[in-house]
Amino acid sequence: MLSFVDTRILLLLAVTSYLATSQHLFQASAGRKGPRGDKGPQGERGPPGPPGRDGEDGPPGPPGPPGPPGLGGNFAAQYDPSKAADFGPGPMGLMGPRGPPGASGPPGPPGFQGVPGEPGEPGQTGPQGPRGPPGPPGKAGEDGHPGKPGRPGERGVAGPQGARGFPGTPGLPGFKGIRGHNGLDGQKGQPGTPGTKGEPGAPGENGTPGQPGARGLPGERGRIGAPGPAGARGSDGSAGPTGPAGPIGAAGPPGFPGAPGAKGEIGPAGNVGPTGPAGPRGEIGLPGSSGPVGPPGNPGANGLPGAKGAAGLPGVAGAPGLPGPRGIPGPPGPAGPSGARGLVGEPGPAGAKGESGNKGEPGAAGPPGPPGPSGEEGKRGSNGEPGSAGPPGPAGLRGVPGSRGLPGADGRAGVMGPAGNRGASGPVGAKGPNGDAGRPGEPGLMGPRGLPGQPGSPGPAGKEGPVGFPGADGRVGPIGPAGNRGEPGNIGFPGPKGPTGEPGKPGEKGNVGLAGPRGAPGPEGNNGAQGPPGVTGNQGAKGETGPAGPPGFQGLPGPSGPAGEAGKPGERGLHGEFGVPGPAGPRGERGLPGESGAVGPAGPIGSRGPSGPPGPDGNKGEPGNVGPAGAPGPAGPGGIPGERGVAGVPGGKGEKGAPGLRGDTGATGRDGARGLPGAIGAPGPAGGAGDRGEGGPAGPAGPAGARGIPGERGEPGPVGPSGFAGPPGAAGQPGAKGERGPKGPKGETGPTGAIGPIGASGPPGPVGAAGPAGPRGDAGPPGMTGFPGAAGRVGPPGPAGITGPPGPPGPAGKDGPRGLRGDVGPVGRTGEQGIAGPPGFAGEKGPSGEAGAAGPPGTPGPQGILGAPGILGLPGSRGERGLPGIAGATGEPGPLGVSGPPGARGPSGPVGSPGPNGAPGEAGRDGNPGNDGPPGRDGAPGFKGERGAPGNPGPSGALGAPGPHGQVGPSGKPGNRGDPGPVGPVGPAGAFGPRGLAGPQGPRGEKGEPGDKGHRGLPGLKGHNGLQGLPGLAGQHGDQGPPGNNGPAGPRGPPGPSGPPGKDGRNGLPGPIGPAGVRGSHGSQGPAGPPGPPGPPGPPGPNGGGYEVGFDAEYYRADQPSLRPKDYEVDATLKTLNNQIETLLTPEGSKKNPARTCRDLRLSHPEWSSGFYWIDPNQGCTADAIRAYCDFATGETCIHASLEDIPTKTWYVSKNPKDKKHIWFGETINGGTQFEYNGEGVTTKDMATQLAFMRLLANHASQNITYHCKNSIAYMDEETGNLKKAVILQGSNDVELRAEGNSRFTFSVLVDGCSKKNNKWGKTIIEYRTNKPSRLPILDIAPLDIGGADQEFGLHIGPVCFK
């Protein structure tokens, strides 16, 4: 975006090229400025007078009000010389004394845009012709070579003390680079994701001007800004009465600036003094060589005030006065007419790459949010180090206007450059919005006069730059030699109301002058009170010029005005001094290309950084080559206009702002001081809540909105009073002589006059007839830069330029610091259940867990079934010895008896210790999304992202709140001498002022005829961007974000309930040998042995006697036949018990010896294969054992439904097929019969008991249901993509299992062949897996999409498997 000074440069260049075709200067001597006269009545239009001689220079007139907005860009495109009006020069009127400034004229209509002309060959300098009327703007020619520096002029006498001037504008900018061709505007990009605000980058190049925004409400009155570019000349207003001239005080040394006084009221008009006779005007001679500088003459006594002359050149700026207090805001000014659309400029070169920030971890990008309301203005970044100049790049395309940057830091004042060439008057620019008030700056040194710059092509109007720091007051320079009478300057804007000064001493009453003829309508006055918008009236006819009043106080230098109407040719005069270059002659044939200008030093191309805030212009530098194309910056919102501040020294270039949105049209306000800022607009309505997406990194601020639409035009306010003049400053040193510029291409030879001898300068004669225009001569010496006039009123926005293609992207900045962690996003939708994987291998048995804490005692269960007989008890204590029985004969062993009946159930054993923890069950389905958590803490700042594409324009934002009043800055340095302003209308005669010092006697001129009404002014430059628009409406909800990552594992759950008692263990190893048993009874007597050998004959025995035969026969088993059956019975009982124990430990899965679950069978017989086996989950009697399928691969126990297949047919016809609802198959369609499981000889109650035990013994269950369909949706409807027609399943504990909702109660689908109605059979396999076995088996199903005559379905109930 162009800064204010850029705009001035462009305007000066444009005016230079324009003035080259019509320029006529008048000689004037600086007289004392008289007070401003009152507004006189409108005179009738008088006849043209005879040509008069040039009068002496009058004092500079005060700045006039702003003219209409001028055109920016190249002007010759629509200029057809054949259609131009015949601007013949009129006869020159008598030079009257200087008149008081006229009132402001209304803004002229916008002119047309011209096409660029080719540069002509430079010709010899022809005689200076009369100034022609303003032509349409021509296209900027190629830059000419700098002219040779002129000789220093004679030093003039010190002028009287001038009035205190308004703050001066910044000095001329340095040489402007050659302007590239305008490119087309690029298409506006989509809004990028907002990044966090990066660190301030190095100042970037000035951006191209943004599209004008609509006029916003008036902001708070800003500081006094630098005067804006001159507006086009308005229609002459009626002349006001002339006030009396105050007495001239002796010029004192410049004092310190006093406190600002209040602005005084307009003094009464002084009487018109007598007009001196005009001598005949001689023909314009060839320029004579400049004479030596004479010593300043003593001031003569004050002469009687002369009649009011036409407005003279702007006087040398007086010492800047102290800034007055901030005036109250005036009503809004009317909107100016729209300017023609400017040619698209090329983008500027890319700015230097900003310093990279610390690299952070990149955050995940969030979806682009809706444009947010404009954020508060960021802190001002520090100025970056200036980069060295880059090599010339190709011309860039014009970028989208950037938003206004922050004011840059103040630079130090440069030394005064040598005098530059007088630039051509540029077209009147539109009044830009006031820039932000700058901070007061350090006083800068007065720089030397700069070298003459080459005229650049007029660029598009830029936004007014931020106000720089006011410089210290410079010393007043010596009064220069009187120049030729210049064209009247444009009437400048009314400055803000200054502080009220002390009333001046009343002047002596002068004689009443003759009433002049009726003057032309005066320009618009200052703002009056706000009236209702009236209908624009027709412009009044221009009145006759009244007699001139006495000179008024010195006013601000007016901005360079457009060329005035041509005067009538005068007779040939004496040879004058070397004149300024004459107007351009008729277009010659295309000349040879001139030598190239000096190329600036090539610097390394810096990486592109973010644009810095626009700084004020620096001194004019040498023209550089066209830089590389910059990327179009997004348009930013215009800032709230501040008071016009004093021009500051250049700051660093600010960042380019994001594009603003176009605001609604506001009512046009009246011109005047800035109003108070409007309140910040209400935020836009909130959008509906979207599904919470995963938290992304913090987005950057959204693009700012555009300025609001201008309001209706108010009526002009009354003219404000003029301030008193301040004391003059000390004389400044003359500038150094400029270097000789390169010679321009040779023009066609014009008619050359004979060179006369260098004589004393005679009085100028009247203007001679215009000779044929000579070709363009060498550039004359530059004139002093005049104060720029105040900025013109803001015109309505011109049409948007064609969007240029985006420039090359700058290099990405370094990553910024990592952003803070965003809020946790909502849980994503649970994915569909995958198909069951192959069964895993059985895990090894884990170590036993520690015993859990004992649970509270449960309620007593129902009486259990009689238990199996207990193990044989220990032997009882030994009975007393019975009587010996009679020995029977030994019988044969009897056969083994049948097993006795089972013994009575023994008492329940103690509760076994808890078994080992079972294997972990399969993971449950994802839970439903939890409630939104509290927002996380702010994350660390994210890395600075690359510049996003420009966002779409959002709706207009509401006008921001007005900023506080800025402090008035100190007065600025005096500006260089401005171009001569246009001649103001002659006011009525004022009262005679006190006698002025005697001036040199001028030749008496003849009375001139009033000039014709001026032509329309040039169109204004394109306006600046409007204020930020209201926040846009909330965007549509974004798509649901992707599911979040799995969360961290939850805390360890509490210990589960004690598991069921484990299975009986296998047989243990044999125990140790027990202690010796009780000694057994004696065994029975064995059979008699064989006879022994005969013994020797014994001795003769004594007398024989008897012996006792009895012994302990009861101690020996089986010797006594009566005891043997008892032994066999014991043996059989032992064997039976052993078998029973063995069957308990290793069940066979038969009906007589069922296992508790299939898992027990697999553990007991790992070598067995899967198949159907009998199980008895509730143990006890085997009569209620059930047949189940054992899958030894997975350890699952699967129980089949009694009726597995339900035939396919039309089960249900609805009376109202459109009224769809879920219909339970078992409960409603099938007569209340739910699905049953395993009916082989087991009652429903027994089966329910077995299933209950089975659920207790398992920690995981699963079941599949196959839904056969024809024209019936089972799960997803392919037409709508949703699950609203899915079936519902009823679990065992009356829980309803659905296709969507809480993830714990949702089933999944392995195959979905029932998603469309195509008159074909399909099937959908539904699977439900859970670690809550109490929910299975499935007892019923409720389809929704049934009831039509063509809708059929059937079912296959898969087995329920527990594990």
From Swiss-Prot:
UniProt keyword annotation of Signal present: yes
The keyword Cell membrane belongs to this UniProt entry's keyword annotation: no
Biased composition (Basic and acidic residues): 140-154, 737-746, 1004-1015
Modified positions (Pyrrolidone carboxylic acid) in chain numbering: 23, 78
Pfam families assigned: COLFI (PF01410), Collagen (PF01391)
Chain residues that bind Ca(2+): 1176, 1178-1179, 1181, 1184
First and last residue of the signal peptide: 1-22
Locations listed in the record: Secreted, Extracellular space, Extracellular matrix
4-hydroxyproline: residues bearing it: 440, 443
Residue numbers carrying 5-hydroxylysine: 176
UniProt entry keywords in alphabetical sequence: Calcium, Collagen, Disulfide bond, Extracellular matrix, Glycoprotein, Hydroxylation, Metal-binding, Pyrrolidone carboxylic acid, Repeat, Secreted, Signal
Modification comment: Prolines at the third position of the tripeptide repeating unit (G-X-Y) are hydroxylated in some or all of the chains. The N-terminus of the mature protein is blocked.
Gene3D superfamilies reported for this sequence: 2.60.120.1000
GO cellular component: collagen type I trimer; collagen-containing extracellular matrix; extracellular space; fibrillar collagen trimer
PANTHER family: COLLAGEN ALPHA (PTHR24023), COLLAGEN TRIPLE HELIX REPEAT (PTHR24023:SF1082)
Protein name per Swiss-Prot or TrEMBL: Collagen alpha-2(I) chain
Organism expressing this protein natively: Gallus gallus (Chicken)
